[in-house]
Amino acid sequence: MKVALVVTSGQPVVGREAQAIDNARAADAFWRNAAAEGKCSEPEWFWSSTAPAMTIVKGEAEDMQMLMATPEWQRLIMAAPLLIQNFSWELRMCGFDPLFSQFEAAVKEMGLA
């Protein structure tokens, strides 16, 4: 199953701007290295003048979970909320069918369709 790691972030914590930049660069390098090894997509960064920044990395669920369990990623993800306001992340299933087919099966099983 394909999944996407979706990371959102706001402005750096005042006084920690340089550390926030270092953390973002290290996170970008982490995912670019994994992409070069064929384990995921390259990170895509989305910027907005009025909304939080967003980064998306896609890959197979097993590969992404293994990458996210590494000590290197754990250090980066644990430090990020200390450096960046409104930091959050989530792992989402990709595509219409994976979730919809499960929902459809549950609806039929319950006799609601």
PLM region spans:
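Short S/T/G/P-rich N-terminal loop/turn motif that feeds into the first structured element of a domain
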Residues: 1-52, 59-69, 89-113
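A common structural junction motif
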Residues: 28, 72-79
